[in-house]
């Protein structure tokens, strides 16, 4: 049973306590008697903790719009007369401090921080009778706070640091902290505590096995390993963190190998990973979604164009978020003699060659660009994999039930390979993934250090496409040039003629400081002089 199915009614009853702020500093005071009377029992604390998990629900949308769309994985075309957030993000429009996506991501991530802070401020006043439950719940809250702050630092850089609930006046006097301070004072200590307090089998407040979806020891180790590797790259370049990352990631891999967890054995099983009946089976940590109003995966609606009813009855967003040529070519690189794609991930991630239009008079093949179908459980996909149609259950855009992975074993394996290089274990990590996907293992030439680094990068693109990883990889490697190259590829034809001059403007808009997003305009206006706007947007 999924976490939200188990506690949905309880989480919904928390609405008065956890109503979302429209602004990080626009804090509505909560009735003191209500909060003090509520946080008194382990059962109530568990409901409050589920409220913190509930804050993860919108994050899949930001993984798509703020990571994938910003990267060289996607192609969104050229700006039209109608404003679209994803188009402004993709084109590196410098005037994006006012768009909803940039504002909402800030607010939603700080909402998680706020909920975690409130929980942690109350937990010591509660009498827990079952050993270990209090420490586990604290570990979960701190894991989630670290997760939120990690995204805040990666997206916005300098953000306000707060570890306790704040009044309006306190919030309005809290300036930004440097990114390294956020890492050292919140993210790392929180995850270190989580590593020391979480287990592989979380318990509920009565000591029983919990519903799926809660943070585990392996999740904490994997996230801390990712944090350390991020700190070792641009812009901090703290090389001391690389060995710390290696140790943690190796522990995760060794645990997975010893237990058989988190790994799809073959290509067929890998394809079924993206069916909601297999949620909580393969991913190390994932956002929980169910078929219920406002509890479904919101990114699915945004990730695909409008589709014929034979695939999904619900009218989709119609967004023009396509797979960019570079990634498309990577996934289609290996073909057999008849031209069939060997990489099973192509079929499950972007391949639309079998799609047809909804023309009642004739069947016409879809002629547009490949788009991301990994998270869309359309009728044909489920039928081909042997699952019943769930189309009737998808009442609106908020009902898609497929979980969204925040940490996968394959991500851990490839981060580890990046660190250790072409050692026997590093090569094995890459070859395992390639072998399962149906493409050849690395050649001797590809095991040379420079070539191996490139192979790891390519494998991360193929394996983790549409999962919100790519932009952060580009930033970590200080490789915004890859996005410039993407626009250049679309701007110029085979003869070197400029056919899309607007894209040359986009290239000029990619400045060094655009590895960060702007501080939302709504935040900049709350109190003049409190925050300093990121350099590329001043």
Label every model-predicted segment:
Residues 1-30:
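Bacterial Sec-dependent N-terminal signal peptides
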Residues 21-74, 93, 103, 118, ...:
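Acidic, glycine-rich segments characteristic of secretory precursors and extracytoplasmic regions
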Residues 36, 62-81, 162-165, 199-218, ...:
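Short, surface-exposed recognition loops and adjoining beta-strand edges that mediate ligand/DNA contacts
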Residues 42, 46-59, 81-156, 172-185, ...:
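Conserved, well-structured interaction surfaces
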Residues 49, 53, 57-60, 83-108, ...:
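Elongated scaffold/linker segments in the mid-to-C-terminal portions of large proteins
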């Amino acid at each position: 049973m999924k976490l939200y199915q188990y506690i949905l009614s309880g989480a919904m009853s928390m609405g008065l306590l956890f109503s979302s702020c429209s602004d990080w500093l626009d804090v509505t005071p909560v009735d003191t008697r209500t909060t003090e009377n509520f946080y008194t029992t382990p059962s109530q604390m568990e409901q409050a903790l589920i409220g913190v998990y509930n804050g993860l629900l919108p994050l899949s949308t930001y993984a798509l719009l703020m990571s994938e769309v910003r990267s060289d994985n996607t192609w969104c075309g050229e700006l039209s007369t109608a404003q679209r957030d994803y188009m402004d993000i993709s084109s590196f429009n410098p005037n994006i401090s006012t768009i909803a996506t940039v504002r909402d991501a800030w607010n939603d991530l700080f909402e998680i921080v706020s909920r975690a802070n409130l929980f942690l401020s109350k937990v010591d006043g509660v009498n827990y009778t079952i050993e270990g439950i209090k420490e586990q719940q604290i570990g979960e809250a701190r894991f989630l706070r670290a997760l939120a702050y990690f995204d805040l630092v990666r997206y916005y850089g300098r953000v306000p640091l707060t570890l306790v609930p704040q009044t309006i006046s306190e919030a309005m006097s809290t300036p930004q902290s440097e990114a390294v301070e956020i890492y050292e004072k919140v993210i790392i200590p929180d995850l270190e505590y989580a590593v020391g307090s979480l287990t592989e089998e979380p318990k509920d407040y009565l000591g029983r096995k919990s519903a799926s979806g809660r943070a585990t020891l392996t999740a904490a180790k994997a996230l801390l390993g990712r944090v350390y590797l991020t700190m070792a790259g641009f812009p901090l370049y703290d090389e001391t963190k690389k060995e710390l990352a290696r140790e943690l990631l190796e522990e995760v891999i060794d645990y997975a190998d010893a237990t058989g967890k988190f790994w799809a054995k073959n290509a067929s099983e890998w394809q079924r990973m993206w069916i909601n009946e297999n949620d909580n089976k393969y991913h190390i940590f994932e956002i929980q979604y169910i078929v219920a109003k406002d509890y479904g995966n919101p990114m699915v609606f945004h990730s695909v164009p409008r589709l014929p009813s034979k695939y999904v009855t619900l009218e989709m967003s119609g967004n023009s978020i396509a797979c960019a040529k570079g990634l498309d070519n990577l996934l289609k690189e290996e073909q057999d003699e008849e031209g069939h794609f060997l990489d099973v991930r192509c079929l499950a991630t972007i391949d639309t060659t079998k799609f047809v239009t909804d023309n009642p008079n004739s069947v016409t093949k879809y002629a547009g660009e490949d788009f991301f179908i990994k998270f869309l459980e359309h009728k044909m996909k489920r039928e081909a994999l042997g699952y019943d149609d769930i189309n009737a259950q998808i009442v609106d855009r908020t009902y898609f039930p497929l979980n969204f992975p925040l940490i996968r074993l394959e991500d851990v394996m490839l981060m580890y390979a990046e660190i250790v290089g072409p050692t026997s274990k590093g090569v094995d990590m890459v070859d395992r993934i390639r072998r399962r996907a149906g493409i050849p293992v690395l050649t001797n030439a590809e095991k040379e250090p420079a070539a191996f680094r490139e192979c790891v990068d390519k494998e991360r693109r193929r394996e983790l496409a549409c999962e919100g990883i790519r932009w952060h990889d580009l930033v970590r490697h200080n490789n915004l040039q890859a996005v410039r190259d993407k626009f250049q590829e679309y701007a110029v034809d085979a003869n070197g003629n400029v056919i899309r001059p607007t894209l040359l403007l986009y290239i000029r808009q990619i400045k060094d400081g655009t590895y960060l997003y702007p501080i939302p305009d709504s935040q900049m206006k709350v109190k003049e002089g409190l925050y300093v706007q990121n350099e590329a947007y001043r």
